[in-house]
Amino acid sequence: MATPSSLWLGLALLGTLGVLQTPAQASLQPNFQEDKFLGRWFTSGLASNSSWFLEKKKVLSMCKSLVAPAPDGGFNLTSTFLRKDQCVTRTLMLRPAGPPGCYSYTSPHGGSNLEVSVVETDYKNYALLHTESGPSPGPAFRMATLYSRSQAPGAAVREKFTAFAKARGFTEDGIVFLPRNEKCLEEHE
């Protein structure tokens, strides 16, 4: 049996080599610029391991989100989406949780703590985000999200999201591009 000091040394070495990565340590957009991330985004694509998502993905539709600065250095993420033929608006408080581009929030469904990382963005067209739940007794909740500045992301962006989601272990049937719904997505250019 390994001594406690050799066990810690082994874990430290694995962490240094990048073998043990947490969502916050997973790749982040280099030199993330929070001010360029602000503004309107559309949730254009999703992938998740959630049983709820897999059951409901055929009835989900695109939502509009507004990212605004919060006093604590994080973001207020206000999303408007269609639910039961009504537009519903909800706001999440994204709190800084590490280097720029890494945030945490409390799920409105169950109160669990989640970490979201902006993995890649060009700020003008798309952003790829990865969300994961903290330690829990069951399987970790994971989600990949494609944000786009327009309601119709191009083929290259869609392909980039598909590759991004698959690289995080999501299968083809766990990836969905959300259809537009005219009711809640006014453009306001």
UniProtKB/Swiss-Prot annotation:
Which residues bear sugar attachments? N49, N76
Domain of life of the organism in this record? Eukaryota
Q: Quick one: signal sequence residues?
A: 1-24
Q: What GO CC terms are in its UniProt record?
A: extracellular region; extracellular space; Golgi apparatus; nuclear membrane; perinuclear region of cytoplasm; rough endoplasmic reticulum
What's one Pfam family the UniProt record gives for this protein? Lipocalin
E.C. number: 5.3.99.2
Q: Does the keyword S-adenosyl-L-methionine apply?
A: no
Extract one GO molecular function annotation from the record: small molecule binding
Which Cys residues form disulphide pairs? Answer: C87-C184
Entry keyword set: Cytoplasm, Disulfide bond, Endoplasmic reticulum, Fatty acid biosynthesis, Fatty acid metabolism, Glycoprotein, Golgi apparatus, Isomerase, Lipid biosynthesis, Lipid metabolism, Mast cell degranulation, Membrane, Nucleus, Prostaglandin biosynthesis, Prostaglandin metabolism, Pyrrolidone carboxylic acid, Secreted, Signal, Transport
- Where is it mostly found? endoplasmic reticulum
Pyrrolidone carboxylic acid-modified residues are Q25
Tissue expression from the record: Abundant in the brain and CNS, where it is expressed in tissues of the blood-brain barrier and secreted into the cerebro-spinal fluid.
Annotated active site = C63 (nucleophile)
Enzyme kind, highest EC tier: isomerase
Could you tell me the Gene Ontology terms of the biological process aspect for this record?
Answer: mast cell degranulation; prostaglandin biosynthetic process; regulation of circadian sleep/wake cycle, sleep
Name its cellular compartments.
Rough endoplasmic reticulum; Nucleus membrane; Golgi apparatus; Cytoplasm, Perinuclear region
For this protein, the record's InterPro entries field holds: Calycin, Lipocalin, Lipocln_cytosolic_FA-bd_dom
| UniProt function note | Catalyzes the conversion of PGH2 to PGD2, a prostaglandin involved in smooth muscle contraction/relaxation and a potent inhibitor of platelet aggregation. Involved in a variety of CNS functions, such as sedation, NREM sleep and PGE2-induced allodynia, and may have an anti-apoptotic role in oligodendrocytes. Binds small non-substrate lipophilic molecules, including biliverdin, bilirubin, retinal, retinoic acid and thyroid hormone, and may act as a scavenger for harmful hydrophobic molecules and as a secretory retinoid and thyroid hormone transporter.
Provide the family line. Belongs to the calycin superfamily. Lipocalin family.
Q: What is known of its domains?
A: Forms a beta-barrel structure that accommodates hydrophobic ligands in its interior.
Q: What is this protein called?
A: Prostaglandin-H2 D-isomerase
Per the UniProt record, the source organism is Sus scrofa (Pig)
